[in-house]
């Protein structure tokens, strides 16, 4: 949620910067006009309530003096009726203001690239050199099916498209990957959390998924409950409507969870493999920080995600997303993309974002500054990493000509020392 007062004071600045995110100028004008109406109604209501209190005192004084107070009583009834009407009108206007503001994305950091889509993203740096194969590299779905460790066909029979069964060493590899990730994040000071996988709408609102993206999640019929699209939701709402003790900041959380996504609007994209699923495991990182520390913490979070890939020996690069490609709640986002040999390109495996105080305003998460004044914290979130995509990257980057897959050294302790996944005879 953006600061309505700041929008009012810097309207043209908000039009310009939010315009780079597809927000039309009239949306800002309508919000400012509705907020003006809200403030005018508030003043009018408060004045009438003050008048009612004065009349009430006059009636009490008249009764003490045993004087006729019928005129004052009649006047107070009229004032009371008017106040009730204004309160109802004010409630509707306040709801309009809240709804209009809730649909506005976060203000982009002024240093990020401006552009309508991913073509405007800017590469920051590369790590690792893509392997040169002396044979034609296969796609991870073919590797997994040939080895008997991934079964997409039976998953489609059971659940439909965009699901998978991990089997045998495939399941063990997935488990090894996320246990390795959690252990690495623990070394960096993250507290491991096992969160709820179903949350209330208020939690989805707090992180910015609701109300704008309700069609992209799975909701429980007849209940105010939603399957989480990411552990960011429960982890960021952990301190909702609380004041975090200043001495506890920064707070680092990490969690493994399934993520459930309807993938609305993704028809025809990544229809095969582990890249775009309705259900997938992801290790998430979430931070609560003081405002002055948040961008330094974003760089550290990006490094934390990158370190996982470096220890797994996976080539990747880091890009800064443009204003038009960035997520709704983010002020700045660094995407980490891993090299996928069969596709001959980099694919997103982690997205690390600084949401500044956008989510904290929606979820009312605060701390006290050095003067004891309540301030909103800054929240950050990042994938550390998407587990299925990491498995896909390992299968493609570590494949051998005979169809086997070498296990990265960092994962072997989690695989009981196994070095190669081979097809069972």
Curated annotation (Swiss-Prot):
Where ATP is bound, by residue?
261-263, 348-351
Q: Cellular location of this protein? A: Cytoplasm
Gene3D superfamilies assigned: Bira Bifunctional Protein, Domain 2, Serine-tRNA synthetase, tRNA binding domain
Residues that hold L-serine according to the record:
230-232, 284, 383
Primary site of residence: cytoplasm
The pathway it acts in is: Aminoacyl-tRNA biosynthesis; selenocysteinyl-tRNA(Sec) biosynthesis; L-seryl-tRNA(Sec) from L-serine and tRNA(Sec): step 1/1
Q: Report any one BP term from Gene Ontology.
A: selenocysteine biosynthetic process
Any one Gene Ontology molecular-function term assigned to this protein's record: transferase activity
Reactions that this protein is recorded to catalyse: tRNA(Ser) + L-serine + ATP = L-seryl-tRNA(Ser) + AMP + diphosphate + H(+); tRNA(Sec) + L-serine + ATP = L-seryl-tRNA(Sec) + AMP + diphosphate + H(+)
Annotated Gene Ontology cellular component terms:
cytoplasm
Specify the domain of life of the species encoding this protein.
Answer: Bacteria
Instruction: Please give the CDD domains that the UniProt record associates with this protein.
Output: SerRS_core (cd00770)
Which protein family is it in?
A: Belongs to the class-II aminoacyl-tRNA synthetase family. Type-1 seryl-tRNA synthetase subfamily.
Q: How does it assemble?
A: Homodimer. The tRNA molecule binds across the dimer.
Q: Which PANTHER family match?
A: SERINE--TRNA LIGASE, SERYL-TRNA SYNTHETASE
Annotated function: Catalyzes the attachment of serine to tRNA(Ser). Is also able to aminoacylate tRNA(Sec) with serine, to form the misacylated tRNA L-seryl-tRNA(Sec), which will be further converted into selenocysteinyl-tRNA(Sec).
Tell me the protein's name: Serine--tRNA ligase
The species is Ligilactobacillus salivarius (strain UCC118) (Lactobacillus salivarius)
Gene name, per UniProt, is serS
């Amino acid at each position: 949620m953006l600061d309505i007062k700041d929008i009012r004071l810097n309207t043209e600045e908000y039009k310009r910067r939010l315009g780079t995110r597809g927000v039309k100028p009239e949306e800002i004008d309508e919000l400012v006009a509705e907020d003006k109406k809200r403030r005018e109604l508030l003043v009018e209501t408060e004045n009438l309530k003050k008048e009612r209190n004065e009349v009430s005192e006059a009636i009490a004084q008249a009764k003490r003096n045993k004087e006729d107070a019928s005129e004052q009583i009649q006047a107070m009834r009229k004032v009371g009726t008017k106040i009730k009407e204004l309160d109802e009108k004010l409630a509707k206007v306040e709801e309009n203001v809240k709804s209009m503001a809730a649909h506005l994305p976060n203000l982009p950091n002024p240093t990020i690239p401006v552009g309508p889509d991913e073509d405007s993203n800017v590469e920051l740096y590369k790590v690792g050199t893509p392997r040169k194969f002396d044979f034609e590299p296969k796609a991870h779905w073919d590797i997994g099916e040939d080895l008997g460790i991934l079964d997409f066909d039976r998953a489609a029979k059971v659940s439909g498209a965009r699901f998978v069964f991990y089997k045998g060493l495939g399941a063990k590899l997935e488990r090894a990957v996320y246990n390795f990730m959690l252990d690495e994040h623990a070394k960096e000071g993250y507290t491991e959390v096992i969160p709820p996988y179903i949350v209330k709408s208020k939690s989805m609102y707090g992180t910015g998924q609701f109300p704008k993206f309700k069609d992209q999640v799975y909701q429980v019929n007849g209940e105010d409950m939603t399957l989480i699209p990411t552990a960011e939701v429960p982890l960021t709402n952990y301190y909702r409507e609380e004041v975090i003790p200043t001495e506890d900041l920064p707070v680092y959380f990490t969690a493994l969870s399934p993520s459930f996504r309807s993938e609305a609007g993704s028809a025809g994209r990544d229809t095969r493999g582990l890249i775009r699923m309705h259900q997938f495991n992801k290790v998430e990182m979430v931070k609560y920080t003081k405002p002055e520390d948040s961008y330094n913490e974003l760089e550290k979070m990006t490094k934390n995600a990158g370190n996982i890939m470096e220890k797994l020996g996976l080539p990747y690069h880091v890009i800064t997303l443009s204003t038009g490609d960035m997520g709704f709640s983010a002020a700045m986002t660094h995407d980490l993309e891993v090299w996928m040999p069969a596709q001959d390109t980099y694919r997103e495996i982690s997205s690390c974002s600084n949401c500044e105080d956008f989510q904290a305003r929606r979820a009312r998460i605060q701390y006290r500054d050095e003067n004891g004044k309540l301030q909103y914290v800054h929240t950050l979130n990042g994938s550390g990493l998407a587990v299925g995509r990491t498995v896909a990257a390992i299968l493609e980057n570590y494949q051998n000509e005979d169809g086997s897959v070498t296990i990265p050294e960092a994962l072997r302790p989690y695989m009981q020392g196994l070095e190669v996944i081979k097809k069972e005879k």
